Amino acid sequence: MYKLVLIRHGESTWNKENRFTGWVDVDLTEQGRNEAYQAGELLKEAGYTFDIAYTSVLKRAIRTLWHVQDKMDLMYLPVVHSWRLNERHYGALSGLNKAETAAKFGDEQVLVWRRSYDTPPPALEPTDERAPFNDPRYAKVPREQLPLTECLKDTVARVLPLWNESIAPAVRAGKQVLIAAHGNSLRALIKYLDGISDSDIVGLNIPNGVPLVYELDENLKPIKHYYLGDQDAIAQAQAAVAKQGKAG
């Protein structure tokens, strides 16, 4: 049996402001930093250790990983930073308040943009300052692979090459792997691992800063998965994530 640990970054400044974030590189709040430290404490107390970690190229995930490593005394851990683990790109919604957007377009439309599998939000114009083309962190990524908007289907297609070419081989080699990423890049991976249908994935909400453990068989198929921590608090956090895109 193999184990894989996933963690969504701690609360970011735009999570706190209920704004669509996507590829915008915002930082953690004080609460977000505390969530990351608490995640590290939970993992340490439960006896976990790691051989390698994967994260995105966005600071809220990177800093979450740092805090986990610090708490676990694993600052020396090899870390792979990949744009493929970035949050889903929210296109022209990037930076907008979710509740205000829902008030303007309706809860149903915003739910489709946030959670449907194959409907992307309106795209950015290529000349928009939020477009990734001139960002140095993507200098080595072919321009045609850089998104101006994404649906979850696009995010799955972006994440899976990293899983197939790097993460899965590391797990099969017996390495203890930690992935610190984002709500939708983790939803994309979980959809693949658990074989969740396109319609059922709408209901999956991942709380900030809570370790999610996957136990996998020899074919890397899930045996079971579970969050570490106070289960009632985790359920409340998941419900709060689900409510973010509603006008009321």
From Swiss-Prot:
Listed Pfam families: His_Phos_1
PROSITE patterns, per database record? PG_MUTASE
EC class (word)? isomerase
EC nos: 5.4.2.11
Please give the biological process terms from Gene Ontology that the record holds. gluconeogenesis; glycolytic process
What reaction does this catalyse?
Answer: (2R)-2-phosphoglycerate = (2R)-3-phosphoglycerate
Asked if DNA-binding is a keyword of the record, the answer is no
Keyword Lipoprotein (UniProt): no
Q: Please name the CDD domains in this protein's record.
A: HP_PGM_like (cd07067)
InterPro entries tied to this protein: His_Pase_superF_clade-1 (IPR013078), His_PPase_superfam (IPR029033), PG/BPGM_mutase_AS (IPR001345), Phosphogly_mut1 (IPR005952)
One GO MF term on file is:
phosphoglycerate mutase activity
Which UniProt keyword terms apply here? Gluconeogenesis, Glycolysis, Isomerase
Q: Which residues bind substrate?
A: 8-15, 21-22, 60, 87-90, 98, 114-115, 183-184
Location of the active site: 9, 87
The pathway is: Carbohydrate degradation; glycolysis; pyruvate from D-glyceraldehyde 3-phosphate: step 3/5
Query: Per the similarity annotation, which family is this?
Result: Belongs to the phosphoglycerate mutase family. BPG-dependent PGAM subfamily.
Q: How does it assemble?
A: Homodimer.
Listed name of the protein: 2,3-bisphosphoglycerate-dependent phosphoglycerate mutase
Organism source for this protein?
Burkholderia orbicola (strain MC0-3)
